Design a protein with these regions (language model features):
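Bacterial N-terminal signal peptides
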Residues: 5-16
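Beta-propeller blade termini and top-face loops
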Residues: 21-204
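N-terminal secretory signal peptides that target proteins for export/translocation
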Residues: 1-2
Length: 204
């Protein structure tokens, strides 16, 4: 019995020594992560920039707000509460929002914030809603990437002008001033020989 106890002690000591000599495998552990803190590494600005605001002329409690990197938001109680109305569409970056002066329930949105900066996102054209932002339809100019302004002719809702900047870091694309006379079904460039257009004066 005494011999068995001695043998057991020897075996236990052998395994203890073996475990003590096992090298520690490299890897992440709690001490590693304690030295790290979350920090912003970009883009420069992720949201919060208001690109445009449109207010219903027939109901001043209804506003539409285009956010540079946050879609389109709507309030029906003069900003007490807000609802995102563009989240299911193809672009989160918005350059402008415009209401049809003849029917403010028709909303036009130009995607792609109109800012020349490394933080900016690009869009995929012009969108239209005929029901106050519930549903949307892409109306073209998908290669414009950055739209600064949309204006609807108050004398004819089928006539729309779009100021498109085009791609920031390359040539081509849909850039310039575009006009539609059929409600956005077709577009014709009326200004811009290879140059983008960011604004227009609609006092005509």
């Amino acid at each position: 019995m005494k011999a068995l106890k001695i043998a057991a002690l020897v075996v236990t000591g052998f395994f203890s020594l073996a475990n003590a000599e096992e090298p520690v495998e490299p890897g992440f552990n709690e001490a590693t992560f304690k030295g790290l803190e979350f920090r912003s590494i970009g883009p420069a600005f992720m949201s919060g920039r208001i690109a445009d605001i449109a207010i219903d002329p027939t109901d001043p409690s209804v506003w539409y707000v285009a956010v540079g990197s946050g879609g389109v938001w709507k309030t029906e109680n003069a900003s007490t509460t807000w609802t995102p109305i563009f989240d299911d569409q193809g672009s989160y970056s918005i350059g402008c929002v415009t209401l049809d002066p003849n029917n403010p329930n028709t909303v036009w949105v130009g995607t792609g914030e109109n800012v020349s900066g490394r933080h900016v996102g690009y869009g995929d054209g012009v969108y239209r809603s005929r029901d106050g932002g519930t549903t949307w339809e892409n109306m073209g100019l998908e290669k414009s990437e950055h739209i600064g302004m949309i204006r609807v002719d108050p004398r004819d809702s089928n006539t729309i002008f779009v100021a498109a900047q085009g791609p920031l870091w390359s040539g081509g694309g849909d850039r310039g001033l575009f006009k539609s006379t059929d409600g956005g079904k077709n577009w014709r460039k009326v200004l811009g020989d290879g140059h983008g257009n960011t604004d227009l004066d609609d006092r005509y």
